[in-house]
């Protein structure tokens, strides 16, 4: 499952949450599609782990991620404006020089990345795996 994979990738056990929504449009010939998952956590203990993590970053989002998230390129992705929390970005594109850097996101003809944003006010994570 994608929570277990992301947990291994980002170093925080995200599997303790409950999936409240999941959509996945992957499955085409080239594996293109969007996976969108919302996970609810019982408290903010996950946020405390993110605060100590080197791969999760405090909001606000950098400009590229903010543009992608709030002017979405896909109708499947709908995330509320989040003021307090953390985000995680991992660029899986074959041309990526640094997978944790979003600066080249719009310099390519396709997207292949994992993005998660945690809302501390609702204790929810919104997870996107985007492949084009």
Task: For each feature predicted by the language model, list its residue ranges.
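N-terminal export/targeting and maturation segments
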Residues: 1-60
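Functional cores of ribonucleases/endoribonucleases
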Residues: 55-131
